[in-house]
Each structure stands twice: as structure tokens, then as C-alpha cells.
Amino acid sequence: RIPQYVTTIPDQTRVLPFLLQLLEHDQMLYGNKSKVIIFTSTTALTSAMHKMLESITSSLPGQEKTSVLCLHGMLSQTLRSRVSQQFRAYESAPSILLTSDVSARGVDYPSVTRVIQLGVPCSKEMYVHRVGRTGRRGREGRADMLISPFESGFVAFQLHDIPLQPLSMEDHAKSMNELVASNEAQTTFDASRVQTAMDHARYCVRETMDMRHLLNTVFNSYVAMRQLLRVSRLQILHPVQNWIRAVFGLE
């Protein structure tokens, strides 16, 4: 019932711009009702992407009204409960939750307009749980998954019976243009601000996080599921290195 899309991105420098386009698309569709969950594979990546998007929200259609929250297993139970309640309560301004799989099951967030997965999950079951956070109680919803080419084996063999639709970045850009031209967009944005915001956000993350630790945690999370991916450690290492470098602007 929920439209589900997978976008394969060979050029890692396009990952962050495309993620921002998905967020822009959701805010243009739903305005202040936009409520997006972004799933990542590790605690470190969740924290890094949270810092990144916190610095970029002013370039999104919702601008400073957009709230960006972070939730993962290293937070205390008290803090996790507080963040969950905050995200659950947002109804009159756009909100984004960066999270690990602690939010994939057993938590009911009403009115989530979109789920975005950065990379494949650890199992088909987890994929279903993640997607299940949107479109609840008969409401509209959508699921997007952004993958690198080395992850395509997981999609082909583990998610073969899931109604995933391939979505190219070009087709999505076309749908964005059509939305703007239709005058149905709830809000607009200034695309020229995005690059400046990305550069500043990358600098903030690099200055405050251990990038080697980040790389190791993401790499190890994929190594643990290499049989499902049907690739070797070496086939994982180089793409993950390129992904981290491109997304966070490393030399």
C-alpha cells in the first residue's frame, strides 16, 4: 500500500544533495505537516547525519521552523523517551528524526509522511519494520531507500518480493519540477542556498566528530551482513570509504 522506492547512487558526491531533495520534496508536499524519519546503520552515523542536517535546515523549504532530532541506543532511556515524545508531538512545523533501528519497531509515531533509509537494513524483517513507521492508520506515506551499487544484491535477493520501484535521480528531479509548476507545492525554497549550507554543515561535522571511528563503525556494520550482500570485505571497504569522504567532504 505504501509507495516504496529505491535509488541506486554510483556517484557518492550526489548522496547528500539527493537526500536534501527528498526532504525538500516532502516539505513542498506537506508544508508544516512534513514529518520524516531517516534510518541509518550505526549510532555514529546517526549522530553525524544529525549534526549535518541541523546545519542545513535553513536551506530547506521549512527553513528555521524545521526541527531535527536524534535518537539512538547510546542515549539514556530518559532522553530517548523525551526525544520520542517531542517528535510525536510535532504537528505544526516540519520535523526530521535521525535514528538507528531503536525506532524501527515498538514505537508509534503518528502522521509520519516519509521514511528514508540511508543504505540497506540488516534484514528483510527490519526493512518491513522501518517502512511500517509511515502510512499508519490509513494515512498517506512513502518510503525511499538510497543505496550504493554494492548493496544491490541485498535488494535483489532479500527484498525480491517487496514492491520496490526503482527511482532515478533524474526522474525525481522531474517530479520536483512538475510539483513546482503545478502550483500545488505547500512552500518553496531557494536552491542556491543549499550548496553553501552543505559546505558549512560538513565543516561542523568534521570539526566535532572522529571520522575514522565513523568509517570503522559503518564498515563493520556492512561486514557483519556481507553474506546477505553477497560481496567480499574488499568490495565493501572502498565504496564505504568513498561514501564517507563524499558525504562529509573529506579530502
Residue ranges of model-derived segments:
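Conserved catalytic network of the ASCE P-loop NTPase/AAA+ motor domain
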Residues: 1, 25-32, 59-64, 86-92, ...
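Conserved helicase ATPase core of P-loop NTP-dependent helicases/translocases
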Residues: 46-104
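Conserved interdomain hinge at the start of the Helicase C-terminal
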Residues: 1-59, 203, 217-222
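A short beta-strand element within the Helicase C-terminal
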Residues: 105-120, 141-146
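Conserved nucleotide-binding/hydrolysis micro-motifs of P-loop NTPases
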Residues: 12-13, 42-46, 75-77, 102-105, ...
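Non-catalytic terminal extensions of ATP-dependent helicases
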Residues: 46-47, 51, 69, 179-251
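Conserved segment of the helicase C-terminal RecA-like domain
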Residues: 126-180
